[in-house]
Design a protein with these regions (language model features):
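An N-terminal assembly and electron-transfer interface module characteristic of large anaerobic redox
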Residues: 1-210
C-alpha cells in the first residue's frame, strides 16, 4: 500500500471516567481502573497523537481534561467508560470543543463468574455499560455529536478495534484538511466567499481558505 505524500497525525483527546464515590469504598478499584486505562491507550493506532486527559473521577478533573483538549485543538475525543459515572464527570471535558465524542463501552470480562463475583469485581470488570444511556442523552442535549462502540476485552474484539481505527482515520483526514492549502484559479477578488465556489462552506467545514 502506497504511503500518503504527507504523514499527518490526528490529535485525539483520550480520557476515562469512573465515579469518585466508589473509590473510598473499594480502593482496589483504583489500580484496576488505572491498568485498564493504560491498556486501552496501547490499543490506539500510531496514526494519532494522544492528548491524554487521564482517568477522571471528578468534575474538576474533567474540566482540566477539557482545558488540555482545547489547548491541543483536538480532532476527536475518545472516552473510555470504566464503570458507572455521572455525566457531570464527562461533559466539562467536551463542552467547549466541536468535535465528535466516541464513547468506548468495552467490558473487561466476557461474562461474570457468578459464584465469585463481589461488588468491586462487578463495578471494576463488568459494568462499563452502566452510564452509556446517561452519557449519550447528555451529549445530545448539549448538541454534541457522539457514537458508541460496544464490545469486550477478554478474548479480543476485532470489531471494536476496527471501529476505533476507523474513527482515528476520520480524525486524520480532518487534520489533513485543516493543514492543507488548496489553490483556486480565477476569482473576482480575494475574500469574496459567496461567488462561484462555495468558499464559505469550505471554510466552515474544513477550515480551508482558498
Amino acid at each position: 500500500m502506497a504511503k500518503p505524500l504527507v504523514e499527518t497525525k490526528a490529535k485525539v483527546g483520550v480520557f476515562s471516567i469512573a465515579l469518585q464515590a466508589y473509590l473510598p469504598q473499594f480502593p482496589q478499584l483504583v489500580p484496576e481502573f488505572e491498568a485498564q486505562y493504560e491498556a486501552f491507550k496501547k490499543t490506539l493506532p500510531d496514526t494519532i497523537e494522544i492528548i491524554d486527559g487521564g482517568m477522571v473521577t471528578t468534575k474538576e478533573q474533567s474540566m482540566a481534561a477539557g482545558d488540555k483538549f482545547r489547548a491541543a485543538d483536538v480532532d476527536l475525543v475518545i472516552l473510555q467508560m470504566l464503570t458507572y459515572c455521572t455525566s457531570y464527570n464527562m461533559l466539562p471535558a467536551v463542552r467547549d470543543i466541536d468535535v465528535p465524542v466516541v464513547i468506548v463501552n468495552v467490558q473487561k470480562k466476557l461474562a461474570p463468574d457468578y459464584a465469585k463475583t463481589d461488588i468491586p469485581t462487578w463495578l471494576g470488570e463488568l459494568y462499563a455499560c452502566g452510564a452509556i444511556g446517561e452519557m449519550v442523552a447528555d451529549l445530545n442535549r448539549a448538541g454534541k455529536r457522539s457514537a458508541v462502540i460496544t464490545g469486550v476485552v477478554e478474548g479480543g474484539d476485532p470489531e471494536v478495534q476496527a471501529e476505533i481505527e476507523d474513527w482515528c482515520r476520520a480524525a486524520q483526514v480532518r487534520r489533513r484538511f485543516r493543514d492543507t492549502n488548496i489553490a483556486q484559479i480565477g476569482r473576482p477578488y480575494p475574500g469574496m466567499m459567496d461567488l462561484y465556489i462555495d468558499e464559505t462552506n469550505l471554510y466552515h467545514r474544513m477550515f480551508v481558505y482558498t
